[in-house]
Amino acid sequence: SPGPGRPEQAGISVPALQRFAGTLPILGVCLGHQALATAFGGRVDRARAPMHGKVSTITHDGRGVFAGLPASIDVGRYHSLVIPPDAVPSGFIVAATVQGGDDEGTVMGIRHQQWPVFGVQFHPESVLTPDGHRLLRTFLETR
């Protein structure tokens, strides 16, 4: 699989997320998003096709890190693993999904229902994510 591997192989990421979720704001990006699912009992599967350097349009619920963003945004994707919609961990909700295309409905964002803990499958820091800086600013202002 292209990319850095599976969440279980990401050093101390999973135990660190389990330890600090609920005490610190957390934003998991790509592998970090997948690690959140793994840390809290969700599942990560291989995507239908690798998405490396691809742009997709997503829709979101306008809450958490998506607050203040247009209802649909373009995002840069660099991954070959995904959290299936039926495998989002307990305590989290799907906050964003792909709109249109062959992988419509693919989970692109999750949010914990009580804690300031967020995951995004895409890369907000990528030039392919024009509104990514706004998402990151919103996260940095999270308390």
Where are these regions (language model features)?
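Phosphate-binding/catalytic loops
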Residues: 114, 119-130
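Catalytic beta-strand/loop cores that center a nucleophilic Ser/Cys/Thr
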Residues: 64-114
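Glycine-rich nucleotide phosphate-binding loop and flanking beta-alpha elements
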Residues: 5-6, 84, 128
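Histidine-centered divalent metal-coordination motifs
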Residues: 30, 79, 123
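Acyltransferase
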Residues: 127-143
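Generic recognition of short, well-ordered alpha-helical segments
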Residues: 11-15, 87-89, 130-134
